[in-house]
Amino acid sequence: MEVNFKQDKEIQEQIEKNIILTKLDDTLNYFRAHSFWPLTFGLACCAIEMMAAGGARYDIARFGYEVFRASPRQADLMIVAGTITEKMAPIVKKIYDQMPEPKWVIAMGSCATSGGPFVDSYNVVPGADTFLPVDVYIPGCPPRPEALIHGLLTLKEKIIHPKEVGRSE
């Protein structure tokens, strides 16, 4: 029996042109990336810039991220904005643990990413990544609303293309 490779190749080309093949995870990640449910966790001045991002000038709603949740059980994205103290760290971790999977974390501002100007203080945690798996870091003191929007779009790309960018654990 002779196998016709030319015919198999033609069939393969027709399938690629006319049938959309994807994995369920890829489809879910696409929709997850376009509909974050952020949990606001403003601990200092960065929270004011986070609120400004929701205002008319920056309009975070155009990306579909405007519905900030007050409950961790309804959120899939935690934006840690501000100084985290040793006393506050277990509470932040507990709130993170209450969020449903999949969940992501953005560390917004110098204090949340590395402790900021207070890093040498006796009670300041040197960054949220010491006890949380941070996905995106937004530098600045405080970072501008444009930086928050850029961080959200960066997280969106990480979710859509996880193998190309990777996820920190």
UniProtKB/Swiss-Prot annotation:
UniProt keyword annotations, A-Z: 4Fe-4S, Cell membrane, Iron, Iron-sulfur, Membrane, Metal-binding, NAD, Quinone, Translocase, Transport
Class of the enzyme per the UniProt entry, highest EC level: translocase
Entry EC number(s): 7.1.1.-
GO cellular component: plasma membrane; respiratory chain complex I
InterPro entries xref list: NADH_UbQ_OxRdtase-like_20kDa, NADH_UQ_OxRdtase_20Kd_su
Subcellular location per the Swiss-Prot or TrEMBL entry: Cell membrane
First-listed, main subcellular location of the protein, grouped into a coarse class: membrane
Cofactor(s) needed: [4Fe-4S] cluster
Domain of life, per lineage: Bacteria
Quaternary context: NDH-1 is composed of 14 different subunits. Subunits NuoB, C, D, E, F, and G constitute the peripheral sector of the complex.
Name of the protein described by the UniProt record: NADH-quinone oxidoreductase subunit B
Organism from which the protein derives: Clostridium beijerinckii (strain ATCC 51743 / NCIMB 8052)
Biological classification of the source: Bacteria, Bacillati, Bacillota, Clostridia, Eubacteriales
Gene that produces this protein: nuoB
